[in-house]
From Swiss-Prot:
It is an enzyme of class 7 (translocase). Keywords: Methanogenesis, Methyltransferase, One-carbon metabolism, Transferase, Translocase. It catalyses: 5-methyl-5,6,7,8-tetrahydromethanopterin + coenzyme M + 2 Na(+)(in) = 5,6,7,8-tetrahydromethanopterin + methyl-coenzyme M + 2 Na(+)(out). Pathway: One-carbon metabolism; methanogenesis from CO(2); methyl-coenzyme M from 5,10-methylene-5,6,7,8-tetrahydromethanopterin: step 2/2. Belongs to the MtrH family. The keyword Heme does not apply. One of its GO terms (molecular function) is tetrahydromethanopterin S-methyltransferase activity. NCBIfam families: mtrH (TIGR01114). This is Tetrahydromethanopterin S-methyltransferase subunit H. GO terms for biological process: methanogenesis, from carbon dioxide; methylation; one-carbon metabolic process. It comes from Methanosarcina barkeri (strain Fusaro / DSM 804). The keyword Methyltransferase applies. InterPro entries: Dihydropteroate_synth-like_sf, MeTrfase_MtrH/MtxH, MtrH.
């Protein structure tokens, strides 16, 4: 637990603040909805889903945020332009302020979402996910023409998962690339780049993933985060072991939540914690660590931005 010498940028997107010194702001929690094989979705191509179930899940997150003081963001995943537009319509109808990630495994879907958010006037809340080494020119062009000003900038280096490899992909590019991801994001008109350290599996770069958090904050002064739960989900031993146990979820969830807490204590500003169904487990745990970070921030002379609503005050 520490204080960075470099000025730490704070970006406000849809009323949620990302960045700052460790403990200065509560950690931002990012849920995922409409992911592959999400039980509430009945047609992934058309975006047909159980609206009542989705709203119940969302309201649970809102309630836990109210209780703990941790802000939240929603990651909206779509497999087709039609489906992601339908999901966005639903979300902006039930929530008129919260920021959301527009995400898909397909670049054309992400591009369509950025364009759609511009058309319906919610681009100021949209966060493009992501600008990465495989982004194609079509997506770059649409993003540049859109009103979207925030994006996840992914530090994934397919050939070098070390801290240096992650830094290189951000600053100079990688194999076949002539520009770093940060330069590309700037050329796309992104004013609020949120770096994702690209969490790697245990045994294949998980250590450098965590070490890259304070390294990047010290180097760039930008908000840093990631989908750290992927470390647990990609852990072959745990996947096999939990199947031998009577309660697989009880075996799995401590590791899932734990990956986030390790990253949080290392300085991660936001956590893409995965399926929104895990909301009850993640919020109290992250709030607990935020209390520790808040106490440390005070000790180091960091002024907590909204002390009354920070877990260090709200929950003690």
């Amino acid at each position: 637990m520490f204080k960075f010498d470099k000025k730490q940028e704070v970006f406000e997107i849809g009323g949620v603040k990302f960045g700052g010194q460790p403990g200065e702001f509560p950690t931002v929690l990012v849920s995922t909805m409409f992911y592959a094989r999400h039980k509430i979705v009945t047609d992934e191509d058309k975006g047909i889903f159980d609206r009542a179930a989705a709203e119940t899940l969302w309201n649970t997150q809102v309630s836990l945020s109210d209780a703990t003081g941790n802000p939240y963001v929603n990651q909206i995943v779509g497999e087709t332009p039609e489906s992601i537009k339908r999901y966005i319509d639903w979300f902006v109808e039930i929530d008129d302020r919260t920021p959301f990630l527009i995400d898909s495994s397909a670049g054309n879907v992400r591009a369509a979402a950025a364009q759609y958010c511009t058309e319906i006037g919610v681009a100021d809340r949209a966060i493009h996910n992501s600008i990465n080494a495989s982004i194609e020119q079509e997506e770059i062009d649409v993003l540049t023409e859109s009103d979207v000003e925030a994006a996840i900038v992914l530090a994934f280096n397919a050939t070098d998962p070390t801290v240096k490899g992650k830094m290189d992909i951000l600053e100079v590019g990688g194999s076949g690339l002539t520009k770093g991801m940060l330069q590309i994001s700037e050329e796309c008109g992104i004013k609020y780049p949120l770096i994702d350290v690209a969490a790697m599996p245990l045994g294949a770069g998980s250590g450098p993933t965590i070490r890259s958090i304070p390294t990047m904050k010290a180097k760039f002064g930008l908000p840093i985060g990631g989908g750290y739960h992927n470390m647990a989900s990609a852990w072959d031993w745990l996947r096999k072991f939990k199947k031998t146990q009577p309660d697989a979820k009880a075996i799995y969830m401590p590791a899932d939540i734990g990956t986030n807490l390790v990253a949080q204590i290392a300085g991660s500003d936001y956590l893409l914690y995965g399926p929104i169904e895990n909301v009850n487990q993640i919020f109290p745990a992250v709030a607990m660590v935020d209390i520790m970070l808040g106490e440390t921030a005070k000790d180091l002379g960091v002024e907590i931005a909204d002390l009354e609503n920070h877990p260090v005050t709200k929950l003690t």
